[in-house]
Design a protein with these regions (language model features):
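Small-residue-biased structural context
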Residues: 1-188
């Protein structure tokens, strides 16, 4: 399933990372410009990484027959809904509020922000595929075990795509945004 999506694997261009070289990741928390809002934003990214891993692991347990189908359906509905809803809300806020603020603070990163916005567009496609497959799997769990296993197998491919997408994308966002915040302090 991973090959069905256009997931970016290339690094953000070197020239866009100028502030990252001045403010490397290891120095962020000690910087006086590193505030709670930034810490919470990074915390949301950590939650997305963990949740993607949990949903993939639970999908594998179902496929291995080590998970009760009804329990799996309930967890998939709950955690899948949290993953999709929060990712959509989070990157929508970034595209319409956060990224314009970063661009205004330092237009040198506009090309990097465009890359991240394109990532968000592709992530929307992947999340829609996840939602469709998860909903179909939940219905089939109650109707036809063989078809449910086939659908959960497809779902596993989609959630694996999400899980492989998130580390690169979120790391690039962090390494583009946090140095701007530390350098320009657009939020005071």
């Amino acid at each position: 399933m991973k090959s069905d999506f256009e997931i970016r694997t290339a690094d953000i261009p070197y020239e866009i990372q100028a502030l990252l070289r001045e403010y490397p990741r290891g120095s962020w928390e000690a910087h006086p410009g590193f505030k709670d809002k930034t810490r919470h934003w990074l915390g949301a990214h950590q939650m997305f990484r963990r949740l993607g891993n949990v949903v993939r692991s639970e999908t594998e347990r179902y496929l291995d027959r080590s998970s009760d189908p009804d329990d799996f359906a309930g967890r998939l509905s709950h955690r899948g809904g949290i993953l999709v809803g929060n990712l959509h809300g989070h990157h929508g806020w970034e595209d319409y509020s956060y990224f314009p603020e970063l661009s205004a603070a330092d237009p040198r990163v506009d090309a990097g922000l465009e890359i991240l916005e394109k990532d968000h567009e592709e992530l929307d496609v992947v999340l829609d595929a996840f939602t469709e497959s998860a909903n179909r799997a939940i219905k089939l769990i109650h109707l036809d075990d063989t078809q449910a296993c086939d659908e959960v197998g497809r779902l596993h491919g989609v959630v694996t795509t999400i899980e492989s997408f998130l580390p690169r994308h979120l790391s690039d966002e962090e390494e583009l945004a946090v140095p701007i915040i530390l350098h320009h302090r657009p939020r005071g």
